[in-house]
């Protein structure tokens, strides 16, 4: 692998690639808010960059993902590195009218693992953000989570979504809908820490996180309610994350102030005060967010937190705009992580 961008083994640079040293100027750091009402100004929250962030797209023949990465390039904060079948990728770019845009192409022969190729680029230092493209979640995550591939840190990798719901007054974080299938108590702590850190990257000082359960009462017949109580108790005595925890709490009490009133549930954050939801397991989180997308016309973005670099991970059926939002999310996480490393 080469030592600096965009020199990458087996790379094909598009005709529109910028000359060395000819990268555009990047926006000044936007004003951070304590609460994000929606996604409207998320790109403006990206701190000023010395250069565009090199996004390594694993599987470069997915239409909306390719659209999204080039929209992010147009917004001025990424440099696309497309990893996949060159012929299919270029045919797609020509069909989308993007063939003359600046990008770097890494050709991967059919049958070879595009995710492994993408990870190798990141490991070499030639990538800032890893992105899942047109490959299944399973085939993407297996090499990502493989310790021998060097993406692991001392933190557990978990997925954090940001969701804009029409009836909720601000963006809502949700975790984990992708990585940890049935989290243990210790894994739930890691999910909570990563979710809190993701919100802190946006300027939240003490995120309010709800521990979702079917019911708000603790019952030994439902292990997640017992674990929620233990997590809240431990957080109050020996904090393990920079956040405020509340739970166990049912979904209606998180979302609706009226539901809390009717149930005589005394919670100051019901109906719009919570910043994030921690689901009891992956299935619950995944079903919840897909229900929001289909029935509530929600808008989402998502990233894997806790890896060596931020990882943009959205559904392959997600709109191009959601891909761009996920890359903005990753850019903000990357800036925050680097700031923490220097502290």
Regions found by a protein language model. Give the residues of each.
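Anion-binding alpha/beta catalytic cores of soluble intermediary-metabolism enzymes, centered on
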Residues: 30-270, 275-343
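Short, low-complexity intrinsically disordered segments enriched in small and basic residues
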Residues: 1-7, 11-25
């Amino acid at each position: 692998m080469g030592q600096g961008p965009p020199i990458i083994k087996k790379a094909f640079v598009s005709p529109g690639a910028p000359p060395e040293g000819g990268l555009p100027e990047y926006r000044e750091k936007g004003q951070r808010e304590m609460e994000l009402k929606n996604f409207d100004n998320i790109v403006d929250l990206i701190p000023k960059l010395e250069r565009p962030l090199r996004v390594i797209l694993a599987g470069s023949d997915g239409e909306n993902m390719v659209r999204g990465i080039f929209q992010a390039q147009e917004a001025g904060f990424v440099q696309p590195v497309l990893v996949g079948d060159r012929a299919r990728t270029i045919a797609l770019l020509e069909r989308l009218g993007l063939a003359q845009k600046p990008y770097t192409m890494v050709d991967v022969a059919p049958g070879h693992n595009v995710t492994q190729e993408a990870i190798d680029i990141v490991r070499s230092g030639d990538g800032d953000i890893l992105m899942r493209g047109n490959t299944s979640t399973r085939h993407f995550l297996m090499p990502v989570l493989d310790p021998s591939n060097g993406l692991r840190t001392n933190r557990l990798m978990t997925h954090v979504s940001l969701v804009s719901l029409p009836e909720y007054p601000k963006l809502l974080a949700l975790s984990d809908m992708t990585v940890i299938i049935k989290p243990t108590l210790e894994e739930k702590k890691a999910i909570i820490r990563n979710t809190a850190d993701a919100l802190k990257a946006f300027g939240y000082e003490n995120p309010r996180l709800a521990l979702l359960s079917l019911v708000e009462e603790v019952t030994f017949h439902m292990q997640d309610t017992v674990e929620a109580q233990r997590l809240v108790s431990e957080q109050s005595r020996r904090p393990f994350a920079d956040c405020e925890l509340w739970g166990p709490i049912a979904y209606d009490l998180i979302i609706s102030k009226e539901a809390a009133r009717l149930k005589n549930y005394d919670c100051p954050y019901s109906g719009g005060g919570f910043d994030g939801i921690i689901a009891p397991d992956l299935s619950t989180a995944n079903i919840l967010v897909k229900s929001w997308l289909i029935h509530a016309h929600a808008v989402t973005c998502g990233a894997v937190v806790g890896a060596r670099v931020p990882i943009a991970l959205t559904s392959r059926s997600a709109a191009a705009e959601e891909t761009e939002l996920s890359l903005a999310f990753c850019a903000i996480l990357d800036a925050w992580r680097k700031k923490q490393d220097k502290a």
